[in-house]
Amino acid sequence: MQDLKQRPVSVFREFLDSEAAGGIILMVAAALALIVANSPLAETYFSVLHAYLGPLSVSHWVNDGLMAVFFLLVGLEIKREMLDGQLSTWPRRVLPGIAAAGGMLVPALVYVFINRNNSAALSGWAIPTATDIAFALGVLSLLGSRVPASLKVFLTALAIIDDLGAVIIIAIFYTSGLSLAYLGAAFAVIAALVVLNRMRVMTLLPYLVLGAILWVLVLKSGVHATLAGVALALTIPLERSAGVGHDLDHSPLHRLEHGLHKIVPFFVIPIFGFANAGVSLAGLSLGALIEPLTLGVAAGLVVGKLVGVFGSSALAIRLGLADLPAHTGWSHMIGISLLCGIGFTMSLFIGLLAFASDVALQDAVKVGILAGSFVAAILGAAVLLMAPAAGVAEEETE
């Protein structure tokens, strides 16, 4: 019984360790992309991205194909945490849920306010709403034991809810030109996946085969293909197979999630970062940095996330709706709110969807994301370094 109670903690530790290491690799991949895009290899770099492999360009294979695997992992994490983890009860969901809501609403409002006179840019309102869990945990990992474990749990839970919000935003606001025939076929495949789940089929292969078919149908339907990964994830059983005991570690969901944790942080996300972070800085001036689109993204990530996450958390705590994470104080919450402004992967992805046909606007978005995420990471790390070490109580929390 003791082992069963401790299992979610060990799984969560594994998740944190994997994502932190992946975040560091992602930083290297993004930096390398910037270097290559501003070197004599730039022409080759962009030519490879626009080269076609079959029906899609390399860039599309990365953004529609590999990112579907990323969204599959996101969906698996959301399902597991909601049913058997850090978000399995309402008290556990309250603070990260409220913080995530504030952390999505306020950055969007900041972006819209700055771009209120720039109608062409308004479709990018969702870009600064995202938090990159890989990058954020990568920064936290560099701070070591100074960061309370409860703060890492809070950040991860917040980011999972944030990812769920991003999935909903993409499905509602960044889907167009629907093909009802392909969409109907996709729903038929989803129904078949649900039937497999209800029949307690515990072998992963039929789910993965139908998932591949679902990806093709969703791609053809006009809905963004990455959402096929989320739909597949929600049908993967969390129950254990008969005769394996009571440990949910043997469930199909956990087995697939465990396998993807070896692929996504160290392969999928770095490739996405390398393929999308490359932007030419030639001719970049201070004026370009304060263009409404770029400034809106950067300010949304830094100011919007700080005000949104910290403000909503503080309000919830003061109203008695939630408690501070264990062994943390307000300075920790300020630091973690700033780190939520690291919005690399999902922000880039939404930016590509928002301005799919305008490379100039995509580049402006990338500069804003890189600048905002860099500032948020530096400020957040600095605040957490100055905060009391883990386990030291702060008078301000009393």
Curated annotation (Swiss-Prot):
InterPro entries: Na/H_antiporter_dom_sf (IPR023171), NhaA (IPR004670)
Pfam family, one: Na_H_antiport_1
Transmembrane segments: 21-41, 56-76, 94-114, 124-144, 153-173, 176-196, 201-221, 263-283, 284-304, 306-326, 333-353, 367-387
GO molecular function, one term: sodium:proton antiporter activity
Keyword ATP-binding: no
GO CC annotations on file: plasma membrane
Reactions mediated catalytically: Na(+)(in) + 2 H(+)(out) = Na(+)(out) + 2 H(+)(in)
Subcellular location: Cell inner membrane
Principal location class: membrane
Membrane topology category: Multi-pass membrane protein
Any GO BP: regulation of pH
Keyword presence, Membrane: yes
Key words, A-Z: Antiport, Cell inner membrane, Cell membrane, Ion transport, Membrane, Sodium, Sodium transport, Transmembrane, Transmembrane helix, Transport
Family: Belongs to the NhaA Na(+)/H(+) (TC 2.A.33) antiporter family.
Function: Na(+)/H(+) antiporter that extrudes sodium in exchange for external protons.
The protein's name in its UniProt record: Na(+)/H(+) antiporter NhaA
Lineage of the species this protein comes from: Bacteria, Pseudomonadati, Pseudomonadota, Alphaproteobacteria, Hyphomicrobiales
Gene: nhaA
